C-alpha cells in the first residue's frame, strides 16, 4: 500500500485563526517487476477433500462463492471446517450484521478463503524455475495440477507472457468447472476471479512481500514536511506477524530516520503486539529509543509508546546559543470507527514529555514537562481518500490545529475496490489492517538548555564605612561582548546609597555608594546584578552583600556589626528576660570564637554575663532581667572596637500598672520646614492586655508636638506627630499617670531643606563661581554645592556618559554633548536635583598624536565636528575653563597646541594658525603639511 498525505497546520493562542487546506494530486509510482525477485513468494494451491481451508488476508487468496439451493452459510462452515467468525470477518462489508449474513439466500455470494498446497514434493521450485499453479475451488472439487509451459519458465518471462498464461489457465479452468457438480454461476464467477487474480499475481506478490509504504510529499519549502515509512513482514502466518519498519522524514529542516521491529499476535477477536525502534536525527545528531505496545480489534486501535533518549547534551542544530538532547516521554493513542458507518473515525491521544525546556509545539515556545491532548475526527468516503482534522491542546494553553488529506493507493487491490464506498469497511477490520504501520511519534521531541555564553561573578563582598565609595570587582565572561549590567539596589537606595557606573569607558566599571550607618539597625544590604551582552542575552543573577560600618569602625576590624534585642519590653519581676544578640564580622565575614563584652549604659537591670564568645555564625548572646520598672540601654564591644555599639532601649514594666511597653518613631530625620512630620507611637499595656482610653503625656526638647496628650485606642496605641522649623536634634518622652518615670524615644534630627545652588557652580580650572558655561571643554570639571539636609551627601548622575559625578564630593566631569540630571541625597533621605543643559558646543582635543592640518580636518569630520573657526574661539574656551592641564584628564600634558581653520590666504600659502589650550601662545604661519599640532574639534 502506498499512501500520499498532504497536511496543513495552524498554530494559535486562545483563538483559532483562518487555515487553508492544501490539496495536491498524488505522484504516480511505477514498478518494473522482475520474476526472479519474488519467485519464492508464490502461493501454491491444491483443491481436494484431504486439504484444509486456511485464512489469508489478501483478496487473491479468497473465493467468491454463490450459495446453491438449500445451502446456507452454516452448512458451508460445517462442511468446509471454517469458523463462522472467520467467514464473518471476510464478509462484513457485504452484510450489515452477522445475523443478516447467516440468512443469505441461494444465489447470494459469500467470500471464502482458499486452501494452501501442502508439501507433496521433495522441494519447492528453485528461484527462477517454473512454479506450479493451480486454480481455486472449494473442498470436494479437485482440479489437477498444471505445470507451466517451458516458455514461461525462463527467468526473462515478461508481464505479457504472465498475463497470457493466466488467461490460458482461466480458460482451461472454465472447461473443467463446467463438468463439475458446481452450478453455472459459480463456475463463471470462479473462473473470472481466478483469471483476474492470476494476471496480477506477480505484482501482488511483490507488494505483499514488501509490506506497506506510506508517503507524504510536501512540494514547497524544499520538501520540508515530507516523510516515507515502510513496513516489511519478516514472517507471516495466520496467528503471528513479525515485521520490520523503516522510515525517513525531513521536517523542520531536520532529516530523521527510524528503524524498528516488532511482532503482532492475532487471536480470533483481537491483536496484541509490541515493537522497538531506534530514531536517529542525522541533522542534529540525536538518538532515541522507542518501545511500544499495540492492542487492536475490529473498528478499534490502541497503542502506547515510550521514548527514551540515547544521546546527551550537545550544541543545537538550529537554535542559536542552545544545547539540545532528546526529551524522555510517552504517548497513548486510541483510534475508533463506527461499525454502522465505518467511513467515520475518531482519534484520541495524550502525550507527555519531561524536561525544563521542551519544544513540544515548537522550538520558540519552550515549556517545562509539557503535555498535550489531541482529539480528532476523520472521514474516508472511499478507500482511496481519507480526510481528517485534529485539535491539540497542551500546557500553557498552547493550541495546534491540523487538517489532513491522504490519498491511499493499494497496488494489491483492483481500482474498483478503491473507489467503492462498500470497501471502506474492510480497512477497519482486524484482517484489513494487519499490515498497517505502527502508530507512534516518529519525530524526536527535543529538550533545550541555554549555553553559558554570558556569565557574571562578583568574587568579593563589600565592607566599608558609611558614605564611602567602594569599587565593585566584577568578572564577566561573554561570547558576544558585554553591553550593560543592570542592578537592583533598591535596598541600598532606600537608605541613601546606590550602585553607579564610575564613568569610565568600561561597561563593567561600577562603584557602590554606601549610605549612613543605622544605629541599632541592620547595616547589611543585598544587591543583585545581571549582565546583558550585545545580542540581548542575559546572565544569571549575582548577589552582592554590602556591609556598612560606622565611622567608629575600621575596615579589617573584628567588630560588632549588629546588636539587637528579641523584644522591646519585659516584666519587671526579676524573672522574665530579654535576649540580646551581637553579630561579629570582619569585612562582612562572620567571626567565630570572638569575645564580646556587654555593659548597661543606662537604667537598672542585671546581665546574665559581662562577656560571651561568638558561635560558628559569629553570634554572641546575653540576657537581661530587672525587678524595677524603667528603660535600659545595653552596649556590646569587641577588643578591636574603639567605641561600643548600643542597642535600642528596652522597657521593664510593672504588670500591675498601666505602663508604656513600647515607644517608636517612624523615621529619625525630617526637614525643618514645619511640615515634614515625625510620627511617634506609644503602646500601653497592663498585665498582658492593652489599655484603652489611657491618657499619655508627651514632651519634646525641640519642635512642636501635634498634642501634648493623647488617649490610647482600643489596641492600646496613642500617636502624636512632631514638626520643627529649627534645625537640630530632638528627644521626645512619654509618660502615663500610673508610672512616674518618662520613657524616651530614639533621638531624631531636623535639617533644613536640601538644595543645589545652580548659580554657584565652581569651575575647577579657574576657581570662578557662577553659571555653567554654554561651551564645554571635554573632561572639564565643576564643583556643585549642596546645602541643607544633614550635611552628609551622596551624589549621582542619571547619565554618566554625558556627565559623571563623584559620589562624595559632588565634582562633575563633563564628557559628551547632551543633557543629564545630577542628584544629591542627604542622609535624612532628602533629594535635590540639578539639570545640566546641552551645551552650544563641545571642545574635544584629540590627544593621540600631532597631525598635519589636512589630517586634523579629516579627523574632526569623521568625529562629526570641525576645527575651531579661529584662535579667538579657543581663547574664549581658555578664559572660561583655564589651562586644560588643570583637569585630571589632561594633567600630564604640558602643551595642547591645536590647529584652527585656515583663512583663504593661509590655504594659498600652505600654512595655518594654532592655539595652545595649556599656555595660550597663539601662533601663525605654521606649515600645514607637517605634524605640528593636535586635532582639536568643535562638536
UniProtKB/Swiss-Prot annotation:
Top-rank lineage group of the source organism: Bacteria
Chain intervals for the UniProt region annotation (C-type lectin domain): 842-939
Site (Implicated in intimin receptor Tir-binding): 889, 891, 896-899, 903, 905-907, 911-914, 919-920, 925-926, 929-930, 932-934, 936, 938
Location of the region described as Intimin receptor Tir-binding in the Swiss-Prot/TrEMBL record: 842-939
Big-1 domain boundaries: 560-653, 660-751
Disulphide-bonded residues: 860-937
Region spans: Signature sequence for beta-barrel assembly machinery (BAM), which recognizes the unfolded beta-barrel in the periplasm: 402-411
Entries under PROSITE patterns matching the protein: BIG1 (PS51127), LYSM (PS51782)
Annotated signal peptide: 1-41
Segments of this protein annotated with the region Required and sufficient for interaction with intimin receptor Tir: 750-939
Positions of the UniProt region annotated as Peptidoglycan-binding: 40-153
GO BP term, example: cell adhesion
Keyword Transmembrane helix annotated: no
Pfam family for this entry, one: Intimin_C
Region feature (Sufficient for homodimerization): 40-153
GO CC entries: cell outer membrane
Region (Required for periplasmic localization): 40-212
Miscellaneous notes: 'Inverse' autotransporters have an N-terminal translocation domain followed by the passenger domain, as opposed to 'classical' autotransporters which have N-terminal passenger and C-terminal translocation domains.
Family as reported in the entry's similarity comment: Belongs to the intimin/invasin family.
Protein name, entry field: Intimin
Organism of derivation: Escherichia coli O127:H6 (strain E2348/69 / EPEC)
Gene designation per UniProt: eae
Amino acid at each position: 500500500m502506498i499512501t500520499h498525505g498532504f497536511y496543513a497546520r495552524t498554530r494559535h493562542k486562545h483563538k483559532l485563526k483562518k487555515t487553508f487546506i492544501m490539496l495536491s494530486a498524488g505522484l504516480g509510482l511505477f514498478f518494473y517487476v522482475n520474476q526472479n525477485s519474488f519467485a519464492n513468494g508464490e502461493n501454491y494451491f491444491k483443491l481436494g477433500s484431504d486439504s484444509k481451508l486456511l485464512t489469508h488476508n489478501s483478496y487473491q487468496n479468497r473465493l467468491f462463492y454463490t450459495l446453491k439451493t438449500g445451502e446456507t452459510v452454516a452448512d458451508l462452515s460445517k462442511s468446509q471446517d471454517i469458523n463462522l467468525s472467520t467467514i464473518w470477518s471476510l464478509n462484513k462489508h457485504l452484510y450489515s450484521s452477522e445475523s443478516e449474513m447467516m440468512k443469505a439466500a441461494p444465489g447470494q455470494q459469500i467470500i471464502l478463503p482458499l486452501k494452501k498446497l501442502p508439501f507433496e514434493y521433495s522441494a519447492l521450485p528453485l528461484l527462477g524455475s517454473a512454479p506450479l499453479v493451480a486454480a481455486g475451488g472449494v473442498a470436494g472439487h479437485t482440479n489437477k495440477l498444471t505445470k507451466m509451459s517451458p516458455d514461461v519458465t525462463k527467468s526473462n518471462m515478461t508481464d505479457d507472457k504472465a498475463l497470457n498464461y493466466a488467461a490460458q489457465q482461466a480458460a482451461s479452468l472454465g472447461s473443467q468447472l463446467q463438468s463439475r457438480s458446481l452450478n453455472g454461476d459459480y463456475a463463471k464467477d470462479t473462473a473470472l476471479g481466478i483469471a483476474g487474480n492470476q494476471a496480477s499475481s506477480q505484482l501482488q506478490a511483490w507488494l505483499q512481500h514488501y509490506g506497506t509504504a506510506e508517503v507524504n510529499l510536501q512540494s514547497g519549502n524544499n520538501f520540508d514536511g515530507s516523510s516515507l515509512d515502510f513496513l516489511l513482514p519478516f514472517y507471516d502466518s495466520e496467528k503471528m506477524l513479525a515485521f520490520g519498519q523503516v522510515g525517513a522524514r525531513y521536517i523542520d529542516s531536520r532529516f530523521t530516520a527510524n528503524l524498528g521491529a516488532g511482532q503482532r499476535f492475532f487471536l480470533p477477536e483481537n491483536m496484541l503486539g509490541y515493537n522497538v525502534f531506534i530514531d536517529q536525527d542525522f541533522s542534529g545528531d540525536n538518538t532515541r529509543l522507542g518501545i511500544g505496545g499495540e492492542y487492536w480489534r475490529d473498528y478499534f486501535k490502541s497503542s502506547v509508546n515510550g521514548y527514551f533518549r540515547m544521546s546527551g547534551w550537545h550544541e543545537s542544530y538550529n537554535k542559536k546559543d542552545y544545547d539540545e538532547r532528546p526529551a524522555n516521554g510517552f504517548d497513548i493513542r486510541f483510534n475508533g470507527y463506527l461499525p454502522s458507518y465505518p467511513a467515520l473515525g475518531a482519534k484520541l491521544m495524550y502525550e507527555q514529555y519531561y524536561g525544563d525546556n521542551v519544544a513540544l509545539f515548537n522550538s520558540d515556545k519552550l515549556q517545562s514537562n509539557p503535555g498535550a491532548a489531541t482529539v480528532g475526527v476523520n472521514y474516508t468516503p472511499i478507500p482511496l481518500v481519507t480526510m481528517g482534522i485534529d485539535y491539540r491542546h497542551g500546557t500553557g494553553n498552547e493550541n495546534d490545529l491540523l487538517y489532513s488529506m491522504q490519498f491511499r493507493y493499494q497496488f494489491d487491490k483492483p481500482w474498483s475496490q478503491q473507489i467503492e464506498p462498500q470497501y471502506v469497511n474492510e480497512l477497519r477490520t482486524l484482517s484489513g489492517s494487519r499490515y498497517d504501520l505502527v502508530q507512534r511519534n516518529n519525530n524526536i521531541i527535543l529538550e533545550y538548555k541555554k549555553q553559558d555564553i554570558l556569565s557574571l561573578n562578583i568574587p568579593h563582598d563589600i565592607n566599608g564605612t558609611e558614605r564611602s565609595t567602594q569599587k565593585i570587582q566584577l568578572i564577566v565572561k561573554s561570547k558576544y561582548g558585554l553591553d550593560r549590567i543592570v542592578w537592583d539596589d533598591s535596598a541600598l537606595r532606600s537608605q541613601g546609597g546606590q550602585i553607579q557606573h564610575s564613568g569610565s569607558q568600561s561597561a563593567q566599571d561600577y562603584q557602590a555608594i554606601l549610605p549612613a550607618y543605622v544605629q541599632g539597625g541592620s547595616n547589611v544590604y543585598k544587591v543583585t546584578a545581571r549582565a546583558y551582552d550585545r545580542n540581548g542575552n542575559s546572565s544569571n543573577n549575582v548577589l552582592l552583600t554590602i556591609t556598612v560600618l560606622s565611622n567608629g569602625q575600621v575596615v579589617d576590624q573584628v567588630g560588632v556589626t549588629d546588636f539587637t534585642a528579641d523584644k522591646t519590653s519585659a516584666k519587671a519581676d526579676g524573672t522574665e528576660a530579654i535576649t540580646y544578640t551581637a553579630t561579629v564580622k570582619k569585612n562582612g565575614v562572620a567571626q567565630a570564637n570572638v569575645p564580646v563584652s556587654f555593659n548597661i549604659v543606662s537604667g537598672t537591670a542585671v546581665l546574665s554575663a559581662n562577656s560571651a564568645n561568638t558561635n560558628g555564625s559569629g553570634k554572641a548572646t546575653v540576657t537581661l532581667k530587672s525587678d524595677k520598672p524603667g528603660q535600659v540601654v545595653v552596649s556590646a564591644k569587641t577588643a578591636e572596637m574603639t567605641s561600643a555599639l548600643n542597642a535600642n532601649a528596652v522597657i521593664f514594666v510593672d504588670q500591675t500598672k498601666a505602663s508604656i511597653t513600647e515607644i517608636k518613631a517612624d523615621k529619625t530625620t525630617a526637614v525643618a520646614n514645619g511640615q515634614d512630620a515625625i510620627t511617634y507611637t506609644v503602646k500601653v499595656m497592663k498585665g498582658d492586655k492593652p489599655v484603652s482610653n489611657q491618657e499619655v503625656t508627651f514632651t519634646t526638647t525641640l519642635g512642636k508636638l501635634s498634642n501634648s496628650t493623647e488617649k490610647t485606642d482600643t489596641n492600646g496605641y496613642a500617636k502624636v506627630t512632631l514638626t520643627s522649623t529649627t534645625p537640630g536634634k530632638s528627644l521626645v518622652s512619654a509618660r502615663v499617670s500610673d508610672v512616674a518615670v518618662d520613657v524616651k524615644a530614639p533621638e531624631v534630627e531636623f535639617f533644613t531643606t536640601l538644595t543645589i545652588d545652580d548659580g554657584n557652580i565652581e569651575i575647577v580650572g579657574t576657581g570662578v563661581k557662577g553659571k555653567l558655561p554654554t561651551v564645554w571643554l571635554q573632561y572639564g570639571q565643576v564643583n556643585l554645592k549642596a546645602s541643607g539636609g544633614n550635611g552628609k551627601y551622596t551624589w549621582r548622575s542619571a547619565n554618566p556618559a554625558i556627565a559623571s559625578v563623584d559620589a562624595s564630593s559632588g565634582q562633575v566631569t563633563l564628557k559628551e554633548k547632551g543633557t543629564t540630571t545630577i542628584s544629591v541625597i542627604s542622609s535624612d533621605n532628602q533629594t535635590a536635583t540639578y539639570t545640566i543643559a546641552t551645551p552650544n558646543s563641545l571642545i574635544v582635543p584629540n590627544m593621540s598624536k600631532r597631525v598635519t592640518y589636512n589630517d586634523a580636518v579629516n579627523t574632526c569630520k569623521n568625529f562629526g565636528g570641525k576645527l575651531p573657526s579661529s584662535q579667538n574661539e579657543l581663547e574664549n574656551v581658555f578664559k572660561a575653563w583655564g589651562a586644560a592641564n588643570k583637569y585630571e584628564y589632561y594633567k600630564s600634558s604640558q602643551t595642547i597646541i591645536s590647529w584652527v581653520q585656515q583663512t583663504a590666504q593661509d590655504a594659498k600659502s600652505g600654512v595655518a594658525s594654532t592655539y595652545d589650550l595649556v599656555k595660550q601662545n597663539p601662533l601663525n604661519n605654521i606649515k600645514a603639511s607637517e605634524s605640528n599640532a593636535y586635532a582639536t574639534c568643535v562638536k
